[in-house]
A protein has these predicted regions:
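ATP-binding N-lobe of GHMP and related small-molecule kinases
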Residues: 1-112, 126-151, 328-331, 341-357
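Short capping/connector residues at structural and topological boundaries
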Residues: 31-32, 47-51, 113, 119, ...
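Charged/polar, low-hydrophobicity segments characteristic of intrinsically disordered regions
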Residues: 83-87, 166-175, 241-246, 250
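Gly/Ser-rich oxyanion-binding loop with an adjacent helix/lid
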Residues: 90-201
Length: 357
């Protein structure tokens, strides 16, 4: 720390971090530790839907941080950032010497079924980990902190801000949570799946069909808490372990049928857990179900490789083989957009990692 305190220059860094969509869902936290998952999850990065964040670390003033959203003050975001910085302060002692000037912007609107907190905390944590490396004298980002490399450290920090954020660090499918199916997997940070994705399941794309662009009726934090006394929680956690092992095998072997079954089943299990908790919630809307039925019908008629997944809300993610882009997008425009609010949708490729900006 003496080395760090001697270096009181202004440091500035920026990252663009993608959001991600979980295939096997993270839903429920362990009762011990900070933001540790009750089951492992796996996700694909959404490289075209991202947060861009810059952090300038200046010698400490009377405030710990100043936050702006696209250059404008956003007081409603400050409590989450303050809580995050307070939680990591013990692990990042250098923070006490600096004031952070944070500016962030998403290239997608809030309330669209995209994990904005994943992209936002992912980008912020990358900036923090980068500054940490510079303060330690590792300009090439090749230092290790508590045994973690730069990407693991970024994932570790982002997990404390938003659990799903820790899966936004990799171009490969990212696994968060201990699993016998993935070497090196951890509850503390995400790792790459570790095996090559078969050609039949690589290069897939995601169309986010926006059924409802309002605020979610239940926050992620409250939703996770519902699992604490849920009658089906243990069965769900066990099934997630099983599904993670199965989907890793499916992606490795190119078993598209198995991949589709697991992804869609996981989406429905997530909503089933919400509908059978106390209090209970129905987060799907009639148009959510209409879109799902249209996807099933089109897949049955054409045999095209595609499936849906859901977050904890009404919007639908349509995952499909990017090689079938024209056919699928014609289907989206002709059959699905009429079910979307103001015909809104977003598109992204999968499989891109964060970049320095």
């Amino acid at each position: 720390m003496d080395h760090i305190k001697q270096q009181m220059e202004i440091l500035e860094v920026g990252y663009r971090c993608p959001s991600n969509i979980a295939l096997v869902k993270y839903w429920g936290k362990k009762s011990t530790g900070v933001q540790l998952p009750a089951n492992p999850s796996i996700s694909l990065s959404l490289g075209d839907l991202y947060a861009s964040t810059t952090v300038k670390a200046s010698p400490r003033t009377d405030v710990a941080f100043v936050f702006t959203l696209a250059g404008a003050s956003k007081p409603s975001f400050e409590p989450k950032i303050e809580a995050f910085l307070n939680k990591i302060a013990v692990d990042c002692a250098w923070l006490s010497d600096y004031t952070l000037y944070i500016d962030s912007v998403n290239n997608f609107p809030h309330g669209t079924g995209i994990a904005s907190s994943a992209a936002g905390f992912g980008a912020l944590s990358l900036c923090m980990a980068h500054i940490e490396q510079l303060l330690m004298g590792y300009a090439a980002l090749d230092g290790r902190v508590n045994g973690m490399d730069f990407w693991q450290r970024s994932s570790y920090l982002s997990r404390i801000g938003s659990g799903s954020a820790c899966r936004s660090m990799y171009s490969q499918p990212a696994v968060w949570g201990e699993s016998d199916a993935v070497a090196g997997s951890s509850d503390l940070y995400a790792v790459e799946m570790g095996v090559a994705v078969h050609a039949d399941l690589s290069g897939w794309k995601d169309v986010v069909l926006i059924v409802d662009d309002g605020e979610k009726s239940v926050s992620s934090t409250a939703g996770h808490a519902l699992l604490e006394n849920h009658p089906y929680a243990l069965a769900r956690f066990g099934k997630a372990q099983e599904n993670l092992a199965s989907i890793v095998g499916a992606m490795r072997d190119g078993n598209v049928k198995s991949f589709i079954e697991i992804v869609e089943s996981e989406a429905l299990q997530l909503h089933a857990m919400m509908m059978t908790s106390l209090p209970y919630y129905v987060l799907m809307r009639p148009n959510t179900l209409a879109i799902i039925e249209k996807i099933w019908q089109f897949r049955e008629e054409t045999g095209l490789p595609m499936c849906f997944t859901l977050d904890a809300g009404a919007n639908v993610h349509l995952l499909y083989d990017g090689k079938k882009d024209e056919t699928v997008m014609n289907f989206v425009h002709n059959e699905l957009l009429s079910y979307c609010k103001n015909r809104q949708y977003l598109c992204s490729e999968t499989g891109k990692r964060p970049v320095l900006i």
